């Protein structure tokens, strides 16, 4: 196997990167009918596996779970989750030969082994589904020619996929058909029915490609979604302690600050997030964000370049082969940081507005990271819609995991692939922020309110225009229109 993307010529690469079409709701008029009466077997019962399966069953589809014999015999967590929810559970040999659609929802690093084990068992003309295309794009997995290969990728953690479905809604979803494996021309119909069964069609579906999904997903999770939050958490906490702030207060401000700040981002984009600040603080946050963008622009571009070339996947897979030595070392180092071990601050009260007023630097980091990730993806040929979902849209969901159990929880919830990329970014970004940005801070940038200053009306007007006219704000306003029923995401409700 080799990197599939690197086997394509330049025209094909650009075509695949640029695949992005927002689908009309009318295209889902048949909803799940194409898969009604067909046998669907899900491999793996983690967060995505279980919650997608629950939604699909509630949508009237026939769902069963195929697990490894040892998982069944030892009654591991995956077996317990599936059986306790009333699903048929069996081995690969028992369930896959009769399946019309086999959905591989195991972790990325298990995909090659899983596909090798199940492909001989998949019946002629059946379909194989993924929710992330790393195995196809980066590892170059070749699937038997009679098998249709599709992807349905909800742009949320599995728990949110279920919660939104229970509310009668759904989460934005990306679908794709592998161009090398659509022998009967049924791939799009399968993907549409699967997306509808999870509820995704109610929140907006992008028809994309395996390539565009993988390259944009890796970029988002490595930079703004995880890497920037990790680097920002560590640097901001250390600065607060250096300034003599109470460790419990500092820990709480950072732990819950990202969630509170990005809730505004979720509802009204960068514009609303910045509008939560006083005029003096907004001008300062804008200035800081421009400084951060200048210092980190090269790093965002390096990550994008390494993702496009396949260098990131090559290095990560070397670590897989080495027993995850780097991943485990970085995970251990994160667990020993001052922020992770700060007091919980359970008796400290911080109002919603105080998170903004005392977190101007954090707001600036969010703005800079979102815009850099979006701009870098678009410059690379990824469409604005995909870039939006892989940067701004998912950020509140990741921030919510930090609010639950700090960086530990974030790194548990995200995939090992995302966690590895997060460390690669944060390990470089944090020292840069500490050296280049922290020494330039002024009173009111972090840990206390920005002092009121005389406001230059023309400057404020120009800053407001710059915020509102950024391309991510324009596409974001359009896409959020499809998500009018979005609920608040908060660990503190």
UniProtKB/Swiss-Prot annotation:
Record field: transmembrane: none
Pfam family, one: KARI_N
Cofactor dependence: Mg(2+)
Chain ranges of the KARI C-terminal knotted domain: 209-345, 346-486
Residues given in the record as Mg(2+) 1 binding sites: 217, 221
Binding site for substrate: 415
EC number: 1.1.1.86
Protein name as annotated: Ketol-acid reductoisomerase (NADP(+))
Source organism: Histophilus somni (strain 2336) (Haemophilus somnus)
This protein's encoding gene: ilvC
């Amino acid at each position: 196997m080799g990197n599939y993307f690197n086997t394509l010529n330049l025209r094909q690469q650009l075509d695949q990167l640029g695949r992005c079409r927002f689908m009309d709701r009318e295209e889902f008029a048949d909803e799940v009918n194409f898969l009604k009466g067909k046998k669907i077997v899900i491999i793996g019962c983690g967060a995505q596996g279980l919650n997608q399966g629950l939604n699909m069953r509630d949508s009237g589809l026939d769902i069963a779970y195929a697990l490894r014999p040892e998982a069944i015999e030892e009654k591991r967590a995956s077996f317990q989750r599936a059986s306790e929810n009333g699903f048929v559970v069996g081995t690969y040999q028992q369930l896959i030969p009769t399946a019309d659609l086999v959905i591989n929802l195991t972790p990325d690093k298990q995909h090659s082994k899983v596909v090798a084990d199940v492909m001989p068992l998949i019946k002629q003309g059946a379909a194989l589904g993924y929710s992330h295309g790393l195995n196809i794009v980066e590892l170059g997995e070749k699937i038997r020619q009679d098998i249709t290969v599709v992807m349905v990728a909800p742009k949320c953690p599995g728990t949110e996929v279920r919660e939104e479905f229970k509310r009668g809604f759904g989460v934005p979803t990306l679908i794709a058909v592998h161009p090398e494996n659509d022998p009967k021309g049924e791939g799009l119909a399968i993907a549409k029915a699967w997306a509808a069964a999870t509820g995704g069609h109610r929140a907006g579906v992008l028809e994309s490609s395996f390539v565009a999904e993988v390259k944009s997903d890796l970029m988002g999770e490595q930079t703004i979604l995880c890497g920037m939050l990790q680097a920002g958490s560590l640097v901001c906490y250390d600065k607060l302690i250096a300034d003599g702030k109470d460790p419990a207060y500092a820990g709480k401000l950072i732990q819950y600050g990202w969630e509170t700040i990005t809730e505004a981002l979720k509802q009204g984009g960068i514009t609303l997030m910045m509008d939560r600040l006083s005029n003096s603080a907004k001008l300062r946050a804008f200035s800081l964000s421009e400084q951060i963008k200048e210092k980190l622009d090269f790093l965002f571009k390096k990550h994008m370049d390494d993702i496009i070339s396949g260098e990131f996947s090559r290095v990560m897979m070397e670590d897989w082969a080495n027993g995850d030595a780097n991943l485990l070392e970085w995970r251990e180092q994160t667990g020993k940081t001052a922020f992770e071990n700060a007091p919980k601050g359970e008796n400290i009260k911080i109002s919603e507005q105080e998170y903004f007023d005392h977190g101007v630097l954090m707001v600036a980091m969010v703005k800079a990271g979102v815009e850099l990730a979006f701009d870098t993806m678009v410059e690379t040929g990824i469409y604005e819609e995909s870039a939006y979902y892989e940067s701004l849209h998912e950020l509140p969901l990741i921030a919510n995991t930090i609010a639950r159990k700090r960086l530990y929880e974030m790194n548990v919830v995200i995939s090992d692939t995302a966690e590895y990329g997060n460390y690669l970014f944060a390990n470089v970004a944090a020292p840069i922020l500490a050296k280049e940005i922290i020494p330039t801070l002024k009173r009111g940038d972090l840990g206390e309110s920005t002092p009121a200053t005389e406001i230059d009306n023309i400057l404020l007007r120009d800053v407001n225009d710059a915020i509102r006219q950024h391309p991510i704000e324009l596409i974001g306003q359009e896409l959020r229109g499809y998500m009018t029923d979005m609920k608040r995401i908060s660990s503190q409700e």
